C-alpha cells in the first residue's frame, strides 16, 4: 500500500538552534517536493512542486545543470538526494534566497515563531499539520552575507514527527558612530 501525501499527513517539524539571536524570530518552511510514503513507512518518493521547477531549470540559481521542463523532476530528485555536508548547506542557502525573492513566487507553506526562551539550551520553532515532503526551512531576511554558518536547512518530512537543527549564527547589529 502507498500513502499519498495530502493534508491528512499532519506531520510535525520541530526546528532547533542554540543561537539566542533566533529567539522570537519567524521561520518559514517552503515545500520544494511533495512526498508519497509507502504503507510501511520505509520508502518515500518525491515529486518536485511546480513552483520550484524554475529554480532547478536555472543552473546559476540551483547549481543543477541540464534540467529541462521534461526531465526536471528526475534531475532535481537525483541532485538533492546526493547532497551532504557543506554542499547541502550551500544548496539550502541558495534555495532559501530564491524562495525569499518575491519575483520567484514561492509562498511559505508554513510559518512558525522560534521560542523566546531556551529549553535544554535550544530555541525551537514547531510547524504542525505539514504535508509530507521536502522543505527548505529558513529565517526570512537572513542571507549568507549577513550570517555566519548555516541559517537555512533542507528537511525531509516523511513521517509524523521530524526534528532538524539550524546551526548558524544570526548577526548582531554593530552600530558605529
Give short role names for the model-derived ranges:
Residues 1-177:
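Solvent-exposed loop/turn and edge beta-strand elements of beta-rich ligand-binding domains
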